[in-house]
Amino acid sequence: MRRPELIMRSLPLILFLSLGSFHLAAAAVDDQFTFDGFAGVNLTLDGTAVVTPGGLLMLTNGTTLLKGHAFYPSPLRFFHEATSGGGSSTVRSFSTAFVFGIVSEYADLSSPGLAFVVAKSRDFSSALQSQYMGLANARNNGNASNHFLAVELDTIVNAEFGDMSDNHVGIDVDGLASAAADDAGYHDDRTGAFVNMSLLSRAAARVWVDFDARTSLVNVTMAPLELPKPTTPLLSAAVNLSAVIEDEAYVGFSSSTGVVASRHYVLAWSFKMDGPAPSLNVSKLPALPVTIARAPSNVLKILLPIASAALVSALAIAVLVIHRRRRRYAELKEEWEVAFGPHRFSYKDLFRATNGFSDERLLGFGGFGRVYKGVLLVSRVEIAVKKVSHESRQGMKEFIAEVVSIGQLRHRNLVQLLGYCRQKGELLLVYDYMPNGSLDKYLYAENSKILSWAQRFRIIKGIASSILYLHEDWEQVVLHRDIKASNVLLDAEMNCRLGDFGLARLYDRGTDPHTTHVVGTIGYLAPELGHTGRPSKASDIFAFGVFMLEVTCGRRPVLQDTNGGQLLLVDMVLEHWRQGTVTDAVDPRLQGDFAVEEASLVLKLCLLCSHPLPSARPGIRQVVQLLDGAMPLPELSQAHLSCNMLALMQNQMGNSCSVASSVAGNISDIPRAR
């Protein structure tokens, strides 16, 4: 009796579970889903993306220069199967709706936004953060091999992508240059007027994306959370979806942050093939974390009229004061600055941030000017400000043209140029502040912290990666021309950043750089520059070889023995190599605590990179592969690194360093003090 009774009591539960399973199966067949919040929802997440305890899908968590992705875990079929008569498969219509919110740490600064994505793959590991929104990088942006359709909600302007404003919506295919874009907003169904919306309002808003397979049109519509879907879409673009994705594709979201911390949220999401997306129940949505403004007190209500009267009586004085201040902070603007305009700082803000460019804020001297530490008053972001004198060797306009291009560079091992300001005869450049200063003080300063071998090897690999980006991975070739330890800065976590592009040159791929005056730092200049005056990738490699010697040996490029004579550091290392004691050249302050194989590899690679003949030096991609252990180091031979070649280098540079034949006698005479 007890077992039949148990079965009878379990029948409703079994029936309920069966119906639930049938419903889930039907949803999978129909290619549709609805998430009114994400608590317990199965999504594929990577990067900073998480589901909060409250059910919010948080793509970025307020950390700078990171990315996050969230995808529906299973691929969806975007094509109807071919007919039995042998016809080809046809693309399907789809529709999605979602609720999003962006919470920026500072009301006056923002990071890139977020994007809804339809992609062949969920793997965006090679994509960059910042303006690339975690979807592409500088090398593959716009390539047809990317295979993605995205709708971006973008809160910064990038001249590189032709962005129209810092508050726009765009339809992107395989890259971040939008096929169609418009300012964020909606068309009011009652009046027909266009109503602007702020993506940074910290209020949730709705977006609908509809693809019509018959017309190949992608329509994007948005509205405040409390309004229904407007009849007129915000923007439309014709997209040949069959050329973008294949039979199956993933749907989800991508987001990234730049130098300003922001949080990007998705509160709800629905999707359907061959029909309108299911409605979202906005009453069930999790709360978006926002800053709630305080209501004005009764005291303010009483005092406000009195204060207004006092303000009117003070206007005459204020006009005079403002006029004087404007003359003090007067800035120069020209038409060419449109390309870099969104990154322009006001002189007043920089003046205040640096305490009037006071001496106590002076960090040091960089190429073309002094560098000051600053703190932006509103955001409290720490910055470094370089004042470039109008007496620089280059014309001001030519120099700024270089800055406009270099300002587009984005790499984790490059010091980020945040923006600029022009005021009378000065150009002010604003960079990320690096709290641990320059690398050279850790290599040469007395009583400084001694860098471990692991830190040194990571720094060498990081700078090699940045040079690879400059030489090979950006749209133009960038020659740094001044790679050295004092131009490598360290952030709070001792990560390295190559900076000071005051001498850099850019040129298009397939062309040669023009002959210029020989510039750079003695000890790092490739010997051929003395004759040709033409910088090249090989001359940057030479300087990088000397830089690696600096980091590994803890010595300056040009040494002085006890007799007052000079000796090239590369000569000293070469002599150690010939004697089979190359690792004896490693910084003695490490007291033998280093990876012998890594140190030997680096020192031998230094000799190759510092070869006096440009054609004998490896390219930067080969250097990176060697440092990563992806390829074996070529065997070094006496013929490859001969005394005559080193003497040739010294003769070309016209210096007084001793030739290689005298190295052996001088090694023991080099003092250990720095």
Curated annotation (Swiss-Prot):
Reaction(s) this enzyme catalyzes, per UniProt? L-seryl-[protein] + ATP = O-phospho-L-seryl-[protein] + ADP + H(+); L-threonyl-[protein] + ATP = O-phospho-L-threonyl-[protein] + ADP + H(+)
Where, in this chain's numbering, is ATP bound? L363, G364, F365, G366, G367, F368, G369, R370, V371, K386
* Record's keyword annotation contains Membrane: yes
User: Any idea where this protein resides?
Assistant: Cell membrane
Residues modified as Phosphothreonine: T511, T515, T516, T521
Q: Which InterPro entries match?
A: ConA-like_dom_sf, Kinase-like_dom_sf, L-type_Lectin-RKs, Lectin_legB_Mn/Ca_BS, Legume_lectin_dom, Prot_kinase_dom, Protein_kinase_ATP_BS, Ser/Thr_kinase_AS
Q: GO biological process annotations for this chain's record? A: defense response to bacterium; defense response to oomycetes; negative regulation of response to salt stress; protein phosphorylation
Which Gene Ontology cellular-component terms appear in the entry?
plasma membrane
Extracellular compartment segments: 28-301
- CDD domains from the UniProt entry: lectin_legume_LecRK_Arcelin_ConA, STKc_IRAK
> Which molecular-function annotation in GO is an example for this chain?
transmembrane receptor protein serine/threonine kinase activity
In the UniProt record, the signal sequence range is 1-27
The impact of changing D482A is: Loss of kinase activity
Q: Where is the active site?
A: D482 (proton acceptor)
Instruction: Give the UniProt tissue specificity note.
Output: Expressed in root epidermal cells.
Entry EC number(s): 2.7.11.1
The protein, known as: L-type lectin-domain containing receptor kinase SIT1
Q: Which organism is it from?
A: Oryza sativa subsp. japonica
Which gene name does the record give? Answer: SIT1
